[in-house]
Amino acid sequence: MKTFKGIASAKDMRVAIVGSCFNGPIADALVSGAAQTFLELGGAEDRLTIVRVPGAFEIPCTLKKLLTSGIEYHAIVACGVLIKGETTHYDHIADQVSARISELSVEYNLPITFSIITAPCVDSAWQRAGIKGSHLGVSGMRTALEMADLFKKL
C-alpha cells in the first residue's frame, strides 16, 4: 500500500497570492502573513506573485486570469475579508466567491486555498488574522504548499 502526503515547503515552488483590499488592515495582515510564510518555508521572492484586487468579489476573475496567463503556478492563495452587515450582500458575496474558487481549483487541477475570512464582526475577523489565535493567511499558504507538494507526488 502506498500513502502520499505533501510537506509545506516553498522550495522551487511558484505561488501567487490574490488578496482583496477591502477591510484594508485585516486584508493586509492576511496577505503579508501568507507572503512571509512562503519566504520562511524556503520560497524565493521572484517566484511569488502578489495581486491586490478591490474586493473579494474580484478574486475569482483574477484567479482565472492568472490560471490562463501561461505562467505555471503550483498553488494560489486567495485572501480576503468579508464582514457580515445588516443586508444580505455578505451572504451573496461569500457564497459566490467560495463556490467559484472551489470550481476553479477543480477545473484547473490546482490547489487554491480559501484564506478569506467570513466573520460576523470586525473583532472576529481580527482574531482570524493572527491577533488572537490562528492566522488564516499563514495557514492558507502552508496548506497551499502542502497540496502543491502532494500534487507533484501523485
Curated annotation (Swiss-Prot):
Pfam families: DMRL_synthase (PF00885). One of its GO terms (cellular component) is cytosol. One of its GO terms (biological process) is riboflavin biosynthetic process. It comes from the Bacteria. It is an enzyme of class 2 (transferase). Catalyzes the formation of 6,7-dimethyl-8-ribityllumazine by condensation of 5-amino-6-(D-ribitylamino)uracil with 3,4-dihydroxy-2-butanone 4-phosphate. This is the penultimate step in the biosynthesis of riboflavin. (2S)-2-hydroxy-3-oxobutyl phosphate binds at residues 86-87, 128. GO terms for molecular function: 6,7-dimethyl-8-ribityllumazine synthase activity. This is 6,7-dimethyl-8-ribityllumazine synthase. Pathway: Cofactor biosynthesis; riboflavin biosynthesis; riboflavin from 2-hydroxy-3-oxobutyl phosphate and 5-amino-6-(D-ribitylamino)uracil: step 1/2. NCBIfam families: lumazine-synth (TIGR00114). It catalyses: (2S)-2-hydroxy-3-oxobutyl phosphate + 5-amino-6-(D-ribitylamino)uracil = 6,7-dimethyl-8-(1-D-ribityl)lumazine + phosphate + 2 H2O + H(+). The keyword Transferase applies. 5-amino-6-(D-ribitylamino)uracil binds at residues 22, 56-58, 81-83, 114. It comes from Chlamydia abortus (strain DSM 27085 / S26/3).
